[in-house]
């Protein structure tokens, strides 16, 4: 019985705006308005509809989040218990300290629960297009008998449904390219934090997450080189990932496939396992909404324009009777 009730998990919903968090239009991304409700409440609505979610631990600017939750007619109906925590200095501390609270609560229910066995689902506050079925698909795909950290990914083919078209604006996101295809991480993380050896790397990767500039790329490469667990192979796959991304931008000539072919996804997962000193894997989801975070004012505008249509499109993908 991991993480609380049978086959369900506590969720850490990250809504902080300190450290390297980037506001959009000067506002915490989770507190932006979307169809008359804060963005983070759309995320909470999808979480509460998933049978795999036991409870929600919301961490961020406590007073503003509390005020937002007291507004009428929210998409979140309060069917799952919510614990609201004040934020700390950065993303890592928000997650780690919230996990300590989760552990305290779970052990009060189950004193025999070992800290290293507690599994949590970590989700950001700015993915309002995530549908409950994508949460279900991700959690069901996580083999937590074999792995301790699983990240969700979506294929470029899946994400192409959200690309710009003649009749509407869209969002085109950068993908990483491996032998099996092109993918993007989709913001869903299933993890046993106590079995993640290099937990502090989460903050380092987050700090350099917008790796479109060579400065950010090289800074993270230096961090990888300095890691005790890093090898030349680890640095090589990192550079090859970026080489493939750069070559992917050359139109009509698929040169990116050359470095991508040298990177089987399993090899990448093994390297990440070494770097984090854990058992790491990925799970592909087929909806795509969780990958579309609100990262810029343009993304915010596009999601507002297409919200109903893109939610409806994902609903139409759900098999009848599910």
Predicted features and spans:
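The conserved acidic donor/metal-binding loop of glycosyltransferases
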Residues: 124-128
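Acidic donor-binding segment of Leloir-type glycosyltransferases
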Residues: 48-80
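Left-handed beta-helix
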Residues: 1, 262-322
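Short phosphate-binding loop-to-helix
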Residues: 71-118, 129-130
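N-terminal nucleotide-binding beta1-loop-alpha1 segment
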Residues: 1-25
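Short aromatic-hydrophobic micro-motifs that form the base-stacking/packing surface
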Residues: 119-123
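Conserved core of the sugar-phosphate nucleotidyltransferase
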Residues: 130-274, 284-288
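A short, N-terminal amphipathic alpha-helix
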Residues: 37-52
């Amino acid at each position: 019985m991991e993480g609380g009730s049978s086959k369900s998990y506590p969720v850490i919903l990250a809504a902080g705006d300190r450290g390297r968090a980037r506001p959009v239009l000067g506002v915490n991304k989770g507190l932006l308005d979307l169809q008359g409700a804060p963005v983070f409440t759309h995320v909470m609505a999808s979480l509460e509809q998933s049978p795999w979610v036991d409870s929600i631990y919301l961490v961020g600017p406590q007073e503003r989040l509390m005020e937002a939750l007291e507004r009428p007619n929210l998409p979140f109906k309060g069917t799952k218990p919510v614990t609201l925590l004040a934020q700390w200095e950065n993303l890592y501390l928000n997650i780690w300290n919230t996990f300590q609270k989760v552990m305290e609560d779970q052990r009060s229910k189950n004193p025999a629960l070992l800290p290293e066995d507690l599994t949590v689902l970590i989700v950001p506050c700015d993915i309002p297009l995530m549908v409950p079925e994508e949460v279900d698909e991700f959690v069901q795909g996580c083999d937590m008998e074999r792995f301790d950290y699983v990240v969700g990914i979506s294929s470029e083919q899946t994400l192409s449904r959200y690309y710009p078209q003649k009749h509407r604006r869209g969002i085109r996101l950068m993908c990483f390219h491996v032998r099996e295809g092109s993918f993007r991480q989709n913001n869903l993380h299933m993890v046993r934090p106590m079995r993640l050896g290099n937990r502090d790397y989460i903050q380092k990767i987050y700090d350099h997450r917008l790796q479109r500039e060579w400065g950010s790329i090289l800074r993270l490469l230096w961090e990888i080189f300095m890691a005790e667990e890093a090898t030349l192979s680890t640095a090589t796959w990192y550079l090859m990932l970026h080489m493939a991304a750069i070559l992917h931008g050359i139109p009509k000539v698929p040169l990116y496939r050359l470095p991508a072919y040298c990177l089987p996804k399993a090899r990448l997962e093994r390297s990440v396992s070494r770097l984090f000193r854990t058992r790491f894997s990925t799970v592909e989801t087929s909806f795509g909404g969780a990958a579309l975070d609100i990262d810029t004012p343009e993304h915010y505008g596009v999601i507002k324009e297409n919200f109903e249509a893109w939610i409806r499109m994902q609903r139409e993908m759900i098999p009848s009777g599910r």
